[in-house]
């Protein structure tokens, strides 16, 4: 009997990542999640690892552990940090931190995941971009730049990995009620929502629904796409 699918989720301690961890455990997956901080919850068939996604040695060690499971089906690159600040007031170390987590971390996880996925000629990678890219939101220069890089990374990897049976897509979840947007004022939140075709918060279930589609075996022809929830 074939073993259950193995899914890796970065940034799984809270918010979207935690919801997705529970969602895929309920679907019968073995889920490995990671974050910089520890968790105060537990799930059956879930393992949590503390690491910085931008630390290459730590990422390699994680995937050595995953290799022992005999398979890797899905990578959901949810880990990310945001910054709302005018470019002239943004220190360089803040920019470096954003790029390390959002771009370098995503790249390292994609690379290591692909090395395992190619063995079975099957894999699904879902990266997280942001509506800040097409909306060109003021005050989010560094964040938008990092998420634009995620789109480019997704498109190039889709071409590099397609012949190996691995698809690579991106999702921009829009505004979801998580810690990432709780610092926004009501006025700023309404301004951003007004620029979407569907001007409301996305639900966690809606985010999971799109990812369900992208990682399904039947979606093997879908790759190199960025899907923006809310339609900016």
Where in this protein do the model-derived segments appear?
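Conserved glycine-rich cofactor-binding loop
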Residues: 13-14
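Substrate-binding pocket helix/loop in short-chain dehydrogenase/reductase
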Residues: 86-87, 94-99, 181, 192
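Active-site loop immediately N-terminal to the catalytic Tyr-X3-Lys motif
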Residues: 88, 135-141, 163-164, 199, ...
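C-terminal substrate-recognition "lid" of short-chain dehydrogenase/reductases
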Residues: 107, 122, 200-229
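Active-site helix of classical SDR
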Residues: 110, 146, 154
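Residue(s) in the substrate-gating loop at a strand-loop-helix junction
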Residues: 130
């Amino acid at each position: 009997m074939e073993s259950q699918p193995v899914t890796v989720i970065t940034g799984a301690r809270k918010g979207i990542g935690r919801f997705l961890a529970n969602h895929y455990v309920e679907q019968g997956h073995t889920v490995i999640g990671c974050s910089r901080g520890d968790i105060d919850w537990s799930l059956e068939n879930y393992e949590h690892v503390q690491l910085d996604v931008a630390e290459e040695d730590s990422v390699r060690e994680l995937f050595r552990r995953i290799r022992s499971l005999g398979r890797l089906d899905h990578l959901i690159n949810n880990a990310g940090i945001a910054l709302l600040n005018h470019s002239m007031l943004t220190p360089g170390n803040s920019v470096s931190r954003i790029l390390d987590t959002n771009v370098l971390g995503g790249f390292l996880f994609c690379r290591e995941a692909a090395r395992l996925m190619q063995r079975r000629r099957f894999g699904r990678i879902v990266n997280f971009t942001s509506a800040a890219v097409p909306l060109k939101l003021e005050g989010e220069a560094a964040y938008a730049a990092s998420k634009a890089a995620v789109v480019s990374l997704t498109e190039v990897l889709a071409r590099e990995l397609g012949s190996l049976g691995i698809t690579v897509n991106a999702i921009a979840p829009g505004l979801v009620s998580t810690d990432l947007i709780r610092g926004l004022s009501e006025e700023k939140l309404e301004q951003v929502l007004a620029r979407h075709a569907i001007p409301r918060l996305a639900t966690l279930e809606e985010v999971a629904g799109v990812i369900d589609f992208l990682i399904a075996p039947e979606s093997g022809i879908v790759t190199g796409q960025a899907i923006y929830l809310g339609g900016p």
